[in-house]
């Protein structure tokens, strides 16, 4: 973001104008959350984040807010000094901390809204003693807290939190999301994150090393093309799903049903013959390819049949509840290297490719991987903690290195093709259940089978999957909802 701001300045913008736009956007966001005519305390640091805070104070005065500013030192930058002087001319009260600690704490105690404008995206390490003290007091208040850009105390690039940190209800950031908004533990301190424009053009944003957007921004208002009245089932493609094993029939059922709900013209379920009666009894609209098996897992002796079916289909899902052994590895590798249709690898499809990860680059068709953090750790040979600490970097680098689309699941699922990084904001904690991933894989596979660009299919699938989960949570609750309930709430 710092490089992007400099590029904007090099192309005619000024830092003072960017600060004015940032502060105005943040103030208007706070008004949207009910701050008009309320008591607002703004805590300003010494740098440009504090400068944003002074602008916020001026703008809020126009909305009849009772504004007080707590200053953690004198402004040090030219633009921050200028905006502090403007705020003083409007008779906005200034309290210095820690010099007048008692007054500052009394203001915080009585505030309806508090703005954290102490540190911005350049912060590293831990808060100093005075800032940590005021952050701790703010966190005990009942006020609505808004952070400017990122909560003070979090590391912007790595999401680290070292000691006390402001905890926000709302974070207003500018132009693009930052890693701290999607990484742990910093994400838990951001509350809801909104991205505001400061007038930097899309052309300049696109010059960035990579673009970080939300899925809804990327997709736009129209998720899918209209279904023409002259269409037939062939128009919407055939999905081959190689899924299920003994004890995991449910994965096949959820994947298949979700694919049907997501619009595929035909869904062909290839599965061990022993579980065929169970799955067929639940998916009466699907067609089936029973497979030879060993110990309840599909046997590699049907590899040629599966490769042929894959190439006759429009997309392939591999792995949901499939099991993992040498046979599944052979099935996955044969389809990966011989199929010319989009392939979605999930669950045991991912586990089966781990020993043969070099084959991803040899795939003849677009490949989408949908790992959860544990599967991502196996792909990389690292720990889950390392994945969670570096989600953005890992998603980008893995997708770029292996020429795939990667869906790194979790709260704020990430999707990347190696050039763009998308953050999904739909979904809820009620979706953290076995089976949710099977539903997602079926949805993405269904969209790809309908001829939608595979990367867009992944993005659209993740977004719609989260929306379905949100509808289900509203209809039932996060505690009681199940993945099978979510399937009934899929809508495009």
Residue ranges and their predicted role:
Residues 1-72, 170, 181-343, 351-368, ...:
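Small-residue (G/A/S/T)-rich helix-start motifs and N-terminal tracts that mark the onset
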Residues 76-79, 130, 164-167, 271, ...:
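Short acidic-hydrophobic sequence patches enriched in Asp/Glu that either
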Residues 99-102, 152-156, 179, 349-352:
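Short acidic loop-to-helix transition motifs that present clustered carboxylates
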Residues 102-104, 109-126, 314-323, 401, ...:
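Glycine-rich phosphate-binding loop
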Residues 108-112, 165, 310-311, 336:
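A short, aliphatic-rich alpha-helical micro-motif
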